[in-house]
Amino acid sequence: MPKLGMREIRRAQLIDATLLTIDQTGLAGTTLASVAQRASISTGIVSHYFGDKDGLLEATMRHVLRDLWQATSRRRRAARADPRSKLRAVVAANFDAEQTSGPVMKTWLAFWSESMHKPQLRRLQHVNTRRLYSNLCADFSKALPRAAARRAASGLAALIDGLWLRGALSGEPFDTKAALRTANDYIDLVLASRE
């Protein structure tokens, strides 16, 4: 009889192996066998837990998204109640060290590419996009009229994605300070127009 919690431990081990495999070989070079080899377990166990490569990528992205959502919630709870602080918390969560590590960044890029072709991944991306927009819009709405808050939220979401994408593609370690400064300057600029 398996140990209590072994399923969760094994899944986490395989998700970590998937992140590292995508980092080293890209999505095309990531197979159930290569993940199994990295995790030092049989391919059959990977197949048992995830079914196929699509299931493995979906589970890995659910893990990455859960980390992002938890970081966002944690940072928003810790922030002061004013809109600027809440918005900065959302930005900081998106540029958190967990989200800007090499393996996670390469997995995000693979996920975005695959989400254009796979409905289950497209749905995950849509949920992520809506959650970010909703958080930003709610916070901007505390300081701006509704239409302006929506525009500001769309602008900041695009800026977060753009800064993140440029950082991911630069081939250098992600410059968190520069990304935070640019995004926070945008927040200050938008909110200053209403102060």
Curated annotation (Swiss-Prot):
It comes from the Bacteria. Pathway: Amine and polyamine biosynthesis; betaine biosynthesis via choline pathway [regulation]. Keywords: DNA-binding, Repressor, Transcription, Transcription regulation. Residues 31-50 bind DNA. Pfam families: TetR_C_6 (PF13977), TetR_N (PF00440). GO terms for biological process: glycine betaine biosynthetic process from choline; negative regulation of DNA-templated transcription. The keyword Chaperone does not apply. Signal peptide: none annotated. GO terms for molecular function: DNA-binding transcription factor activity; transcription cis-regulatory region binding. PROSITE patterns: HTH_TETR_1, HTH_TETR_2. Residues 8-68 form the HTH tetR-type domain. Disulfide bonds: none annotated. Repressor involved in the biosynthesis of the osmoprotectant glycine betaine. It represses transcription of the choline transporter BetT and the genes of BetAB involved in the synthesis of glycine betaine. NCBIfam families: betaine_BetI, PRK00767.1. This is HTH-type transcriptional regulator BetI. The gene is betI.
